[in-house]
């Protein structure tokens, strides 16, 4: 699918093969995320790269040593994402210069970043990923809280000019949404229309240029 109007839409975080195949029909480029927690399997990464091309190492609630290893050994060839609600892990990951922190508000009672962390992200070039999937899986009460924290995180992102992207973070095919639907999520949390489009096109393209 072409973005239209010269835009190229990018899905930055897909975690399942069926979801990837559907996303490829709707987006111009798709990043396949390979999830690791305790150790990084090089052969699994190579296989993913052969199958999907653009690959991210997704570290979920990782030990700090795994974040360090990922950045030192693998950043040249892969994007590095961290998904964690632990502030120490988030801060360390930003300091190390991972490519993105994804949905740090999930599992917390706050946005997961503050003014200090947002400034650090801008300085280090670390993006913030706004993920749809937690909203799809949440109860109505939790959904309202997640949206509240996403709005606050967006305000900080906008204020400090942090890189950003909107993504499905799809674990299953049914999590995938059209670019227009993801842009609508951006508008709901306070983005202007052009900002939402940029979070699906301009900023992802900037992030991906590191690998090209």
UniProtKB/Swiss-Prot annotation:
Catalyzed reactions per annotation: Endonucleolytic cleavage of RNA, removing 5'-extranucleotides from tRNA precursor
Enzyme class: hydrolase
Major location (coarse): cytoplasm
Disulphide bond pairs: none
Organism domain of life: Archaea
GO cellular component, one term: ribonuclease P complex
UniProt KW Signal keyword: no
GO terms for biological process, alphabetical: tRNA 5'-leader removal
EC number(s) from the headed UniProt entry: 3.1.26.5
SUPFAM superfamilies xrefs: PHP domain-like
UniProt keyword Hydrolase present: yes
Keywords: Cytoplasm, Endonuclease, Hydrolase, Nuclease, tRNA processing
GO terms for MF: ribonuclease P activity
Localization in the cell: Cytoplasm
Function text: Part of ribonuclease P, a protein complex that generates mature tRNA molecules by cleaving their 5'-ends.
Similarity-based family: Belongs to the eukaryotic/archaeal RNase P protein component 3 family.
The protein's assembly and partners: Consists of a catalytic RNA component and at least 4-5 protein subunits.
Protein's name according to its UniProt entry: Ribonuclease P protein component 3
Organism: Pyrococcus abyssi (strain GE5 / Orsay)
């Amino acid at each position: 699918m072409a973005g239209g109007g010269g835009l190229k839409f990018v899905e930055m975080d897909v975690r399942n093969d069926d979801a990837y195949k559907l996303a490829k029909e709707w987006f111009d480029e798709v990043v396949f995320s390979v999830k690791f927690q305790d150790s990084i399997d090089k052969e699994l990464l190579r296989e993913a790269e052969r199958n999907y091309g653009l690959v991210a190492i997704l570290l979920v609630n990782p030990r700090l040593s795994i974040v360090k290893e990922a950045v030192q050994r693998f950043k040249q060839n892969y994007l590095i994402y961290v998904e964690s609600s632990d502030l120490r892990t988030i801060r360390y990951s930003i300091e190390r210069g991972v490519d993105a922190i994804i949905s740090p508000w999930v599992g917390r009672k706050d946005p997961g970043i503050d003014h200090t962390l947002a400034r650090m992200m801008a300085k280090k070039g670390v993006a913030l990923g706004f993920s749809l999937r937690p909203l799809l899986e949440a109860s109505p009460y939790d959904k309202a809280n997640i949206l509240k924290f996403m709005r606050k995180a967006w305000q900080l992102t906008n204020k400090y000019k942090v890189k950003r992207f909107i993504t499905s973070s799809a674990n299953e095919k049914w999590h995938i949404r059209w670019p227009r639907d993801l842009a609508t999520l951006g508008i709901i949390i306070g983005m202007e229309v052009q900002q939402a489009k940029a979070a699906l096109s301009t900023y992802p393209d900037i992030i991906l240029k590191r690998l090209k």
